[in-house]
Amino acid sequence: MQFHSSSALITPFKKDLSVDEAAYETLIKRQIFQGMDACVPVGTTGESATLTHKEHMRCIEIAIETCKSTKTPSNSRMKVLAGVGSNATSESLSLAKFAQKIGADAILCVSPYYNRPTQQGLFEHYKTIAQSVEIPVMLYDVPSRTGVSIEVPTALKLFREVPNIKAIKEASGSLKRVTELHYYEKDFKIFSGEDSLNHSIMFSGGCGVISVTGNLMPNLISQMVNCALKFEYQQALEIQNKLFDLHQALFVETNPIPIKMAMHLAGLIENPSYRLPLVAPSKETIKLLEKTLQQYEVIA
């Protein structure tokens, strides 16, 4: 996986709640021009749980088409880490095959949610999906949403026994897990899935981030990651601290509710629309977001 900084893309909707494909393409191009290495369509932040199978595939397709047709400032191509997660192994497998077929660079697969599989079930789930494709696979551990964690021994076993399982997105909130994973397998790539811990994870064995805040501030997230990769601890910490208030504001309600409203307030999307059961943020949250965006000089 030849990338380090990436954003977990929002999925913009029109007023009728259909996917706004033109806005989606524009958001991806902004990521490209502001220095991100990769984009991550249809993950948690992309509201994948309320997209149809057809919409899910179309979002991956748009991301790949846009990245292939738009050069980065360094004349390279931004990578696509396609979200293929589902609580049904068969559906994830179908999405994984589709993503590979149309040119995804790698796939991100969240643990099955709601059904709460055992560790053996998680192992078989990921093994089955990974063996159906040849491109790299990134595990995604976010127990606060899935109800079950990929325990460290299970993650290590998957890395050791399934050749194309190369990385894990860590959104468990546990630095102990990160240090343990890195201690036992230095080549197992760890990506931060917690914006508030980006700096800490990068300096505890992490090699990159998948950021929600990056939707709004891709340039600063990219700069922080690049500083960390060069072991410029203080410079990376300064950027992390600079982003602290924004990280806090963007998670005051369930993600992606605040980030979509923030993107709207910043003039980056026309409609801050959500599909039920997600709803618009409270008036208090909107005021907080406005104040925070003013603090960062995003809005006047």
UniProtKB/Swiss-Prot annotation:
Q: Kind of enzyme, top EC level?
A: lyase
Q: What CDD domains does this protein map onto?
A: DHDPS (cd00950)
This protein's pathway reads: Amino-acid biosynthesis; L-lysine biosynthesis via DAP pathway; (S)-tetrahydrodipicolinate from L-aspartate: step 3/4
Q: Does the keyword Phosphoprotein apply?
A: no
Q: Where does pyruvate bind?
A: T45, I210
Gene3D superfamilies recorded for this chain?
A: Aldolase class I
The regions listed as transmembrane in this protein's record are: none
One GO molecular function term? 4-hydroxy-tetrahydrodipicolinate synthase activity
List the keywords (alphabetical): Amino-acid biosynthesis, Cytoplasm, Diaminopimelate biosynthesis, Lyase, Lysine biosynthesis, Schiff base
Q: Which reaction does it catalyse?
A: L-aspartate 4-semialdehyde + pyruvate = (2S,4S)-4-hydroxy-2,3,4,5-tetrahydrodipicolinate + H2O + H(+)
Q: Under which EC number(s) is this enzyme classified? A: 4.3.3.7
* Annotated positions for site Part of a proton relay during catalysis: T44, Y114
Q: Name one GO cellular component term.
A: cytosol
GO annotation (BP), single: lysine biosynthetic process via diaminopimelate
Active site per the UniProt annotation: Y140, K169
- According to its UniProt record, where is this protein located? Cytoplasm
- Keyword Cell membrane present in the record's keywords: the answer is no
Lineage top rank: taxon: Bacteria
- What assembly does the database describe for this protein? Homotetramer; dimer of dimers.
For this chain, the family text in UniProt reads: Belongs to the DapA family.
User: What is the annotated role of this protein in its UniProt record?
Assistant: Catalyzes the condensation of (S)-aspartate-beta-semialdehyde [(S)-ASA] and pyruvate to 4-hydroxy-tetrahydrodipicolinate (HTPA).
- Put simply, this protein is called 4-hydroxy-tetrahydrodipicolinate synthase
- State the organism named in the record: Helicobacter pylori (strain J99 / ATCC 700824)
Task: Tell me the gene name.
Answer: dapA
